[in-house]
Curated annotation (Swiss-Prot):
Its main location: mitochondrion. Residues 153-312 are mitochondrial intermembrane. Keywords: Copper, Membrane, Mitochondrion, Mitochondrion inner membrane, Transit peptide, Transmembrane, Transmembrane helix. One of its GO terms (cellular component) is mitochondrial inner membrane. GO terms for biological process: aerobic respiration; protein-containing complex assembly. Residues 87-101 have a biased composition (Pro residues). Pfam families: CtaG_Cox11. The gene is cox11. Residues 102-117 have a biased composition (Low complexity). It comes from Dictyostelium discoideum. This is Cytochrome c oxidase assembly protein COX11, mitochondrial.
Length: 312
């Protein structure tokens, strides 16, 4: 064995052998050189010395016939070692999941369904908006009609409470008059009475007295007379006015036939009372200085079947 190894060393370059071995394997060069120098490595006999067959370290034995290295091979022709690595475990390549090819018909059906749903939602929203608008318009129309029917009574109540437009104010209790302070210089006020009717009413309507003089704070009772000249009963209601208009604030009616509807039968004549008082505060109003005449006028209107008033 030693001769064969020596012949091998003579035919090859020792340094090239060692360098090739060290670059291709993990064996320390110093250890391998020491083994060669000390002739502790024995080579196997032919046919392993053939130039075409690699020499495995499994075939290199020491003198005790023990395996030295098991993972390194070298070739005699190329004089270099090659590392024999174990066969790597192949990594399984994931099989791509086939992407399902979308069906054009299904896509078209889905698009059509989405478009139909969107159109239906838009229709519902538009219908709700139209319903809301219609409800608001209906409420507005009802409110306008209600105000038109209630305009005359509301105007009368407003004028009666504020004295606007010469309308007299009502007194709820006769005791209010007694509480007025009459400790002031007073002078008589002349009150003129006037009556009128619409052209359509076949009534004769006039005051029983044309004028009257009274002191501010003094209750005054007067009458108006009305006669129905037809063969059928007629129901009417009267409105009143005061001139000058600024005197209406101080003209308070305690009782008046104009508060209620008046029914007069065929060819019937009735007397209708008016109880009023002129407030003494009129004497303290600078705007009323020089005012000594006040006119109280009434006009009758017809009450129709619907409870509304129309001029007659």
């Amino acid at each position: 064995m030693s001769r064969l190894f020596n012949n091998f060393l003579l035919k090859t370059n020792k340094n090239q052998f060692i360098q090739s071995f060290s670059t291709k394997s993990q064996i320390n060069n110093n250890i391998f050189n020491n083994l060669i120098k000390n002739e502790k490595i024995s080579l196997p006999p032919p046919p392993f010395l053939s130039s075409s067959s690699p020499l495995s370290m499994n075939n290199i034995f020491n003198r005790n016939n023990k395996n030295l290295y098991t993972t390194n091979n070298f070739n005699y022709n190329k004089l270099q070692f090659t590392t024999q690595s174990p066969n790597p475990t192949p990594t399984p390549t994931p099989t791509p999941t086939p992407t399902p090819t979308p069906n054009n018909n299904e896509n078209n059906n889905n698009k059509n369904n989405n478009n139909n749903n969107f159109k239906e939602e838009q229709k519902k929203i538009l219908q709700e908006k139209n319903k809301a608008i219609g409800l608001y318009v209906l409420i507005a129309i009802i409110g306008i009609l209600g105000l038109s029917y209630a305009a005359v009574p509301l105007y009368r109540i407003f004028c009666r409470a504020t004295g606007y437009g010469g309308t007299t104010r009502d007194a709820d209790d006769f005791d209010v008059i007694r509480k007025r302070n009459l400790d002031r210089t007073v002078y008589p006020i002349k009150v003129t009475f006037s009556a009128s009717t619409a052209n359509k009413i076949p009534w004769t309507f006039k005051p029983t007295q044309s004028t009257i003089e009274c002191l501010p704070g003094e209750p005054v009772l007067c009458f108006y007379r009305a006669t129905n000249n037809t063969d059928t009963p007629i129901i009417g209601v009267a409105t009143y006015n005061i001139t000058p208009m600024k005197a209406g604030t101080y003209f308070t009616k305690i009782q008046c036939f104009c508060f209620d509807e008046q029914r007069i039968n065929a060819h019937e004549t009735i007397d209708m009372p008016v109880l009023f008082v002129i407030e003494p505060e009129l004497l303290d109003d600078k705007n009323m200085k020089g005012v000594s005449d006040i006119t109280l006028s009434y006009t009758f209107f017809k009450s129709n079947d619907q409870g509304e008033y129309e001029e007659i």
